[in-house]
């Protein structure tokens, strides 16, 4: 009896301790869950803040990169960029007219001769007449002196300045580049030149351009010494084409593209001829492989060994 009473007392104490511990454990578990939820919310908020900060910093870096290297210019459908496409020679002639009347006062094309224009934009008589309009310093003569003479087809297009120092002095320290290879010397050359010529605009709010420079987002740094040169009706085309800003930009870029790659049409034609000849050679090789060599390759020799 005494042993049974002791056992019952021990059981009651154990049950009582479990009943007291259960609310405590539930309170601790709920507290831990609340703390986990709060820490998860803080982590999510921190990640969101880091993402927003990263986006803002990325946009800032992108804006700084555009300001430093120039705005990325769009791609335009130039008609001579096709595999078998050729230059628009009427556009080249108009582009040369734009170069003569607008660009030649500052920019040179020292790699182009008048004879290069024959058969491309002008007849031989027209090119000779243009060359005769300039005076070229030549010599020495029999007396050892230099002299001037009318230009010939073999002469290069005239340069506006005698040297780089004179060019910089006339342009406020800026040096106008030679345009002979400009579409190959610039990244995305044709599109860049067209976007640069037609991309002048007023500077946005908060950007100041110092005196003597002009805002152009396509030029590295956004400030260029060359003013806007292409304006509607600035040139009167010989063929009556409306001389809009976009038309003049397209024509002068066509002329500069030809100047940089005058052999493009011949290269494309030669490539087409080689592809045609190699295709015939491939067909002939396939014929001999299938009907001649395969017969020899599959032939078996039988040796009759006589004992």
Curated annotation (Swiss-Prot):
Subunit-level organization: Component of the ubiquinol-cytochrome c oxidoreductase (cytochrome b-c1 complex, complex III, CIII), a multisubunit enzyme composed of 10 subunits. The complex is composed of 3 respiratory subunits cytochrome b (MT-CYB), cytochrome c1 (CYC1-1 or CYC1-2) and Rieske protein (UCR1-1 or UCR1-2), 2 core protein subunits MPPalpha1 (or MPPalpha2) and MPPB, and 5 low-molecular weight protein subunits QCR7-1 (or QCR7-2), UCRQ-1 (or UCRQ-2), QCR9, UCRY and probably QCR6-1 (or QCR6-2).
Record GO cellular component, one term: vacuole
Coiled-coil ranges (or none): none
Residues that, per the record, bind heme c: 103, 106-107, 226
Post-translational modification: Binds 1 heme c group covalently per subunit.
Record key words, sorted: Electron transport, Heme, Iron, Membrane, Metal-binding, Mitochondrion, Mitochondrion inner membrane, Respiratory chain, Transit peptide, Transmembrane, Transmembrane helix, Transport
Bilayer-crossing regions: 271-288
Family matches, as PROSITE patterns: CYTC
Transferase in keyword set: no
Record family assignment: Belongs to the cytochrome c family.
Boundaries of the annotated transit peptide in chain numbering: 1-64
Name recorded for this polypeptide: Cytochrome c1 2, heme protein, mitochondrial
Chain ranges of the Cytochrome c domain: 90-197
Top-level taxon in the UniProt lineage: Eukaryota
Keyword Ribosomal protein in annotation: no
Pfam families noted in UniProt: Cytochrom_C1
InterPro entries hit by this protein: Cyt_c-like_dom, Cyt_c-like_dom_sf, Cyt_c1, Cyt_c1_TM_anchor_C
Main location: mitochondrion
Subcellular compartments: Mitochondrion inner membrane
């Amino acid at each position: 009896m005494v042993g049974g009473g002791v056992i019952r007392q021990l059981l009651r104490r154990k049950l009582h301790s479990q009943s007291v511990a259960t609310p405590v454990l539930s309170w601790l578990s709920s507290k831990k869950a609340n703390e986990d939820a709060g820490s998860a919310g803080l982590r999510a908020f921190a990640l969101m803040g880091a993402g927003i900060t990263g986006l803002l910093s990325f946009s800032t870096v992108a804006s700084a990169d555009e300001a430093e290297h120039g705005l990325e210019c769009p791609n335009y459908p130039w008609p001579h960029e096709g595999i078998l496409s050729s230059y628009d020679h009427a556009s080249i002639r108009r582009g040369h007219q734009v170069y003569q009347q607008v660009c030649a006062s500052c920019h040179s094309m020292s790699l182009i001769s008048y004879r290069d224009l024959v058969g491309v934009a002008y007849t031989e008589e027209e090119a000779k007449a243009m060359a005769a309009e300039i005076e070229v310093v030549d010599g020495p003569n029999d007396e050892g002196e230099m002299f001037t003479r009318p230009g010939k087809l073999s002469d290069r297009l005239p340069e506006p300045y005698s040297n780089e120092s004179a060019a910089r002095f006339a342009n406020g320290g800026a040096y106008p580049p030679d345009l002979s290879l400009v579409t190959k010397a610039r990244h995305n050359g044709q599109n860049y030149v067209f976007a640069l010529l037609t991309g002048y605009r007023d500077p946005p709010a908060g950007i100041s351009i110092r005196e003597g420079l002009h805002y152009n987002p396509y030029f590295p740094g956004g400030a260029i010494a060359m003013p806007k040169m292409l304006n509607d009706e600035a040139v009167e085309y010989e063929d009556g084409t409306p001389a809009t800003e976009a038309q003049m930009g397209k024509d002068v870029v066509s002329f500069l593209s030809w100047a940089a790659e005058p052999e493009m049409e011949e290269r494309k034609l030669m490539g087409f001829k080689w592809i045609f000849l190699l295709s015939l050679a491939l067909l002939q090789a396939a014929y001999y492989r299938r009907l001649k060599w395969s017969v020899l390759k599959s032939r078996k020799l039988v040796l009759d060994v006589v004992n």
